[in-house]
Regions:
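Extracytoplasmic/secreted cell-surface and envelope-processing proteins
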Residues: 16-21, 56-61, 141-146
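Generic structural signal for well-ordered alpha-helices
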Residues: 30-38, 121, 146-151
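Active-site-proximal beta-strand/loop segments in catalytic clefts of secreted hydrolases
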Residues: 9-14, 49-55, 111-114, 135-138
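Conserved, mostly hydrophobic/aromatic
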Residues: 7, 48, 124, 132
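Short acidic/polar active-site loop segments enriched in Thr and Asp
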Residues: 44, 130
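Second-shell loop/turn segments in exported
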Residues: 18-24, 106-110
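Short, small-residue-biased leader/transition segments that mark boundaries at the very start
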Residues: 2-5
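Glycan-binding loop/region signatures in secreted carbohydrate-active enzymes
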Residues: 50-123, 149-155
Length: 155
């Protein structure tokens, strides 16, 4: 990190294409990465990586066979609406999720919303990090930018 102007922490992909259904970036795991990073990297160089996507798993999950579909945050909400699914919020992971049935198959979806991103913004402030960076930034998620504008001075 001495040679870097800034470091980007990849704090996501806990829930991933070939893994079991879970939050993409559960807050306790994100915090543990930041806890370690600040012991090795000056905080003014650290950008917290934030996912701008989610995954849709078909259940039951079978390791080595199952493959989740990568979806955008807006797409996740659209799927929930289309199937009348209730979006729940995991208080530990600080992440939204829901299940739905399509063609007789149960699906489980985990994604990011303003509540989960707000929790990650809290870590940026708490640790005094330089800022944040996004994976899959080109996926439209206007609510993120509105939240960001309300919480940070953007340059």
């Amino acid at each position: 990190s001495e040679m870097c102007i800034r470091d980007r922490l990849m704090t996501y992909e806990w829930g991933y294409t070939y893994g079991p259904p879970m939050a993409v970036a559960p807050l306790p795991q994100v915090r543990s990465i930041v806890d370690y990073a600040v012991t090795e990297i000056p905080v003014n160089k650290i950008n917290l990586g934030i996912p701008n996507y989610g995954y849709d798993w078909t259940l039951p999950f079978v390791r080595g066979t199952s493959k989740a579909q990568n979806i955008g945050n807006v797409e996740a909400v659209q799927i929930a609406i289309a199937h009348g699914a209730e979006i729940k919020f995991d208080p530990v992971a600080q992440s939204p999720f829901f299940t739905y049935v399509q063609d007789g198959l149960t699906h489980e979806v985990w994604f990011e919303d303003v509540r989960s991103i707000h929790g990650k913004f809290g870590l940026v402030r708490e640790y005094g990090l330089r800022g944040m960076s996004y994976w899959q930034i080109m996926r439209l998620f206007r609510a993120n930018w509105l939240l960001q504008e309300g919480e940070f001075f953007l340059t």
